[in-house]
């Protein structure tokens, strides 16, 4: 006969107290109505501010509930930033960073070689990449591990030269306006 454990940990391997419970790391505990978006940027590139603006616009102008978490270095300028944005027709009860995103955006092409941005992408998710390379050229720029994840997870890949779009629209240097549209 099994009985409930009065004390336990989930999500870490607790080799000190041995109170860890196993769990399904691929399970998404949120409703499928929750949009979970993660934006990778560089400190002072405007990604965090643009994501905060998107959250405000969604929260004030739609019936959707919205939540944002922002991870960045205290030095801010030049460090990697990760913005986590959720929105849903139902109240959002999640009090943690997004672990399974159905939308991932990379505002800095240089991250392709430095970060595993697709780790958080769920199968079938959308990946939006700011790239100076065209859709025909970009595949060869990806590390093999990234190519494999795109294929295995059946991700939808969208490539935009946000710097060119912004410049053509008279918004030179404002890539985040393009990437958040």
Predicted features, each with a name:
Residues 1-36:
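Flexible inter-domain linker/hinge segments
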Residues 33-43, 47-181:
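Active-site cofactor/cluster-binding pocket
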């Amino acid at each position: 006969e099994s009985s409930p454990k009065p004390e336990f940990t989930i999500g870490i391997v607790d080799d000190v107290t041995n109170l860890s419970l196993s769990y399904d790391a691929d399970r998404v505990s949120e409703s499928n109505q929750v949009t979970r978006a993660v934006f990778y940027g560089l400190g002072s590139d405007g990604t965090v501010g643009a994501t905060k603006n998107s959250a405000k616009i969604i929260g004030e102008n739609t019936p959707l509930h919205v939540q944002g978490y922002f991870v960045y270095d205290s030095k801010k300028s030049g460090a990697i930033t990760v913005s986590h944005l959720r929105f849903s027709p139902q109240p959002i009860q999640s009090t943690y960073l997004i672990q399974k995103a159905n939308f991932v955006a990379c505002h800095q092409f240089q991250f392709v070689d430095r970060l595993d941005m697709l780790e958080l992408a769920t199968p079938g998710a959308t990946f939006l990449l700011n790239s100076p390379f065209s859709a025909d050229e970009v595949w060869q720029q990806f590390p093999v591990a990234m190519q494999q994840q795109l294929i295995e997870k059946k991700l939808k890949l969208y490539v935009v030269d946000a710097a060119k779009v912004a410049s053509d629209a008279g918004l030179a240097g404002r890539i985040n306006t393009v990437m958040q549209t």
